[in-house]
Amino acid sequence: ETDAIVHLAGKAQDTKNESEAAEYFAVNTGLTQKIFDYFLETSAQKFIFFSSVKAAAESVPGEYLTEDAAPAPKGPYGESKIKAEEYLLSKLSQAEKLQKKVYIVRPCMIHGPGNKGNLNLLYQVVSKGIPWPLGAFDNRRSFCSIDNIAFAVEQLIVRDDIPSGIYQVCDDEALSTNELIGLITESSGKKTLIWK
């Protein structure tokens, strides 16, 4: 017997822009619809879908993006994730009639062991001692540690007082790229080289 379904499968954002848009929609939207429809037929009481902050926005005008912000995804990755969310929300009343809960988790960039993507590229640049040429920009970005995302999912599973809905998950504080580089160099014993 299954208590919860945690849906993590999906097509990740392609940093090389080699993927066809249809691939994102087939996997991120179509597969989600199939898994959710299966969930409605099972004894599982909770469905946790890993969407992405990219379903809500490509960039954040203020310091934080809230769940109340009107979604404005850009590109097939974010657009396919928001379409999956819309499908789940369109079936929410059906799930609730069955006493089931539906959680849409929108994590920002997750960091931890084995990280891939842009954060790993930044780590490689910094750990090689290459100076960061964009130090004059004061950008801030939210991250989420793998430990924090695991804790959030655990709470969604074990607690019954959390209502169905959309939850954007991140660490407590946003970091600038310069602060992030400082943390990387400190942890790797390298000297921080930032051009301003």
Task: Label the predicted regions.
Residues 1-29, 34, 38-41, 55:
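NAD(P)H-binding glycine-rich loop region in Rossmannoid oxidoreductase-like domains
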Residues 159-196:
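Mid/C-terminal beta-alpha module of Rossmann-like enzyme folds, strongest
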Residues 115-121, 135-158, 164-165:
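Substrate-positioning beta->alpha
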